[in-house]
Regions:
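Extreme N-terminal starter segment of soluble prokaryotic enzymes
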Residues: 1-5
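Zinc-dependent deaminase
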Residues: 9-10, 26
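Short beta-strand/turn micro-motifs composed of small residues
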Residues: 7-9, 43, 67, 102
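C-terminal boundary of histidine-terminating zinc-finger modules
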Residues: 13
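Short gly/ser/thr-rich secondary-structure transition/capping motifs
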Residues: 21-26, 101-102
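Short, surface-exposed acidic-centric catalytic microdomains
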Residues: 22, 31, 36-81
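A glycine-rich beta-strand to alpha-helix segment
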Residues: 50, 72-74, 78-122
Length: 122
């Protein structure tokens, strides 16, 4: 299974501001959807909650939300408590490519642990 990171980065290397995207570009959002469609996506809880409620969970994708909060529940999502646990779950489901979609702490952990096989950067 390929473990991919997908991120939109500003010229100053910023990936977000106050738990939101820096910009909302239709073509970038379309690209994100096309690339991640029908795959497992892994996101941190804060990043997930920053997605407008009407778009949650992201459709036609298996949404895996990472949280330390053992009582956290979100309808339509798989809740995991570690990045390894989330990746293992996707692998057990015979996923071919899992996407780490943020936020910053999740990206940092995946990169520090040398887990990333492929990066999609816009």
């Amino acid at each position: 299974m390929i473990i991919s990171l997908i991120v939109a980065v500003a010229e100053n290397n910023a990936i977000g501001y106050k738990n939101d995207l820096i910009w909302h570009l239709p073509n970038d959002m379309k690209y994100f959807k096309e690339v991640t469609l029908h795959h497992h996506i892994i996101t941190g809880r804060k990043n997930y909650i920053s997605i407008p409620e009407k778009f949650r969970p992201l459709v036609n994708r298996t949404n895996i939300v990472l949280t330390r909060d053992l009582s956290f529940f979100e309808k339509g999502c798989i809740i995991k408590h570690s990045l390894k646990e989330a990746v293992d779950f996707a692998k057990e489901q015979n996923e071919t490519e899992v996407f780490i979609i943020g936020g910053g702490q999740i990206y940092k952990e995946a990169l520090e642990k040398n887990m990333i096989d492929k990066m999609y950067i816009t």
